[in-house]
Amino acid sequence: MEIRQLRYFAVLAEELNFTRAAARLHISQPPLSLQIAQLERELEVRLFDRTNRRVTLTEAGAAFLNDVRATLAGLKDATVRARAVDQGRAGR
């Protein structure tokens, strides 16, 4: 599982549309679909229900989204702290 896949998952969960999510991520739709499919295979969980016109989160996807958001926020905080320490703005 890659951080990129988690970011892609979170954006798709917000947009519920592959085309809009891909545009927001500045990628094309096929790589987004591929990364989401790989994530689902690795987790052995279907995260989204897909139809020709709709994408919806499964119950498992909604539960996973809560943890993914917390994980991504934690990574962002860790990055900010590391940069602050590196620049002498925080304790070591």
Region roles according to the model:
Residues 12-28:
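Short helix-boundary/capping micro-motifs
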